Structures are given as structure tokens and as C-alpha cells.
């Protein structure tokens, strides 16, 4: 079953929605990439036996924060918290990623850009970027998008054709077993 990762990657990369969305110059793909690499590097750090520095996952988290803002830190923190809550040796695993050192690295890499832009653009940048793009978008309806939460299941199913057919096939096969 070593081919499953390749098939899954190709199914994602060749989905119409991903192809169309990647051509619109929206930073979501870059956010997904940097968050994904950060999480992969954290996972590798959890399970390697060497106890060297843990810098690279934090650098990629910093790049994700530079890409889309604090939402990247929230996504990574929630993912790590959920993962660690399922592990018996969560304290040892948490210490392997050196969270205090990592938060400092993340802060040192991502903060200077935000400070420079804030000094140049002033309060309007803060209000627009943090207030609108990072708070309102995730807590309220913006741009008159009032579709219910399940609407996006439909969009993802259509946007992932023809590969979404295999998802439903897999779900039905699992239920039958």
C-alpha cells in the first residue's frame, strides 16, 4: 500500500477546485503548504531518537504566520494539542519540540515584518489585517456569504470530482464491513 500517498496526493493536486483556486493568487495554498510542512516536521521530531534542536518546524510555522496571520498558529496549536491528547507520553513528546524555544523562534521570525508594516501603514493595517481578515472572517459572515456550514461539503464534493466518487465508495465499503 505504499502507493496510497502518491494516489492521494495526485487526487488532491488534480482536483478541479485545487487547480482553479491555485490560479487565483490566494494565499491559502501557501498557508496549507507551510502549515503542512510544519506539522510534518513536528511529527518527525516526535518520533526521532536524536535530541538535537527543534528549529525547522518552528521556522515553517513562522512562514505560515507571515503568509496568513495568527490563524496559522491556531491551526498548528490545535492540531498538536489534539495529537498530544491521544498520546500516553505526551509530556515527553511535548518537551521534544521545545515549545518555549520554538515560540521565541516563531516570534523572532514573524514579528519584524508585522511591526514594519504597522509602522508604515498604521492602525488601518492592524484593523484590516487582524480585525477583518483574522477575526471577522472566522467569527462572522463576511462578504454576504450566508450559506450554511454544510454548503461547503457540496462544493468540496463537486470541486473534487472525479476523485470524490472514490471517497463515497470508501465510506460505503467501510459501512458494509
Walk through the language-model features, giving the residues of each.
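Membrane-integral, polyisoprenol-dependent glycosyltransferases
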Residues: 1-177
Amino acid at each position: 500500500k505504499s502507493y496510497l500517498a502518491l494516489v492521494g496526493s495526485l487526487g488532491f493536486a488534480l482536483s478541479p477546485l485545487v487547480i482553479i483556486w491555485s490560479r487565483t493568487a490566494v494565499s491559502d495554498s501557501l498557508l496549507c503548504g507551510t502549515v503542512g510542512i510544519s506539522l510534518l516536521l513536528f511529527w518527525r521530531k516526535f518520533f526521532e531518537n536524536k535530541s538535537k534542536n527543534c528549529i525547522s518546524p518552528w521556522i515553517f510555522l513562522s512562514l505560515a504566520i507571515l503568509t496568513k496571520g495568527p490563524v496559522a498558529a491556531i491551526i498548528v496549536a490545535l492540531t498538536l494539542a489534539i495529537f498530544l491528547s491521544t498520546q500516553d507520553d505526551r509530556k515527553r513528546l511535548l518537551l521534544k519540540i521545545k515549545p518555549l524555544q520554538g515560540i521565541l523562534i516563531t516570534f523572532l521570525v514573524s514579528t519584524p515584518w508585522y511591526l514594519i508594516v504597522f509602522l508604515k501603514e498604521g492602525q488601518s493595517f492592524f484593523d484590516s489585517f487582524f480585525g477583518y481578515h483574522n477575526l471577522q472572517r472566522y467569527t462572522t459572515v463576511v462578504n454576504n456569504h450566508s450559506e450554511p456550514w454544510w454548503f461547503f461539503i457540496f462544493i468540496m464534493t463537486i470541486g473534487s470530482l472525479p476523485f470524490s466518487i472514490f471517497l463515497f465508495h470508501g465510506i460505503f465499503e467501510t459501512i458494509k464491513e
